Amino acid sequence: MTATVYCLMPPSADALQGAFVFAALAFISELKPVSVRTNMFEVTITVPIVWASMVLFGPLSAMLVAGLAVAGANGTGWISARVMIYLRSKNRMPRLQNALATIAGPWEDRAEYPAQWVIQQILSNASQDAIAVGAAAIIYNAIGGNIATHEVLVSVPVAEIFTHFIIPFFIAVLAYLLIDEVRLIMAIILGENRPEDTRDWYSFFLRCKMLLIESLPVAAGQYLLLPPVTLLMLYLYVHVGLISGLVVVGPFLALRSAVQK
């Protein structure tokens, strides 16, 4: 039994161009996150974009997508917070202040921080996201994920679709989830108290283990709907091209508006 598999990177498309377009989509979604929350459940459109980049463009370009999106969104958030505070001090343009507050997000509380600290924080956030996506992309390639690299229309046995795409993709997704959770947990713990002696390090690793066990089931629930969205983006990319991201973002924007009302 065979199935027709369309190239996920059309021959006429440029990989670097596609990576920059996906980075722009991820940047927009970082500025105005699309989420649906029920207790601890959250869905964001940014992760499917970087996962699709991981499959479509390979490790280096996927890291570029994640890093540019996070760095751009963080930098824009800080600048928006600075402008908003200036306008507020002058009591000018209240509507623009509200718009800037939405973009600034958590950076509103850090608007007065020195530029050197902000740059270090932005580079740290961007590099962490890039490393997580890059590691997942390397794992995807290492365990046989290669269907997305075909540049022609081919007929492939269904078994090959599973061994060279579906299975590697979900293993890479699990790796991304684990890396992302570990880095967040370590950042939280190290931010509270840095280990100094052997006993501190033992407590540090024990707490990391406990938090990881507690957070993984919650994170798995949060990421539950993201693989299907990623697969939808990959499918649409074949037939629609680089604007496939907009096709996916539209329904999520409508869904968020419905939930927020």
What is each stretch, according to the model?
Residues 19, 23-141:
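Alpha-helical membrane segments and adjacent membrane-interface helices in multi-pass membrane proteins
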Residues 27-33, 170-190, 254-261:
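Transmembrane alpha-helical segments that form the membrane-embedded catalytic/substrate-channel core
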Residues 1-9, 53-54, 137-145, 229-231:
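Membrane-embedded alpha-helical segments in integral membrane proteins
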Residues 1-3, 26, 45-51, 224-233, ...:
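Hydrophobic, membrane-inserted alpha-helices
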Residues 186-261:
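Interfacial "cap-and-anchor" motif at the non-cytosolic start of specific transmembrane alpha-helices
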Residues 53-55, 59-64, 157-178:
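Alpha-helical transmembrane segments
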Residues 2-16, 31-39:
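Short, hydrophobic transmembrane alpha-helix segments
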Residues 10-12, 54-65, 235-244:
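Transmembrane helix interruption/hinge and helix-loop junction motifs
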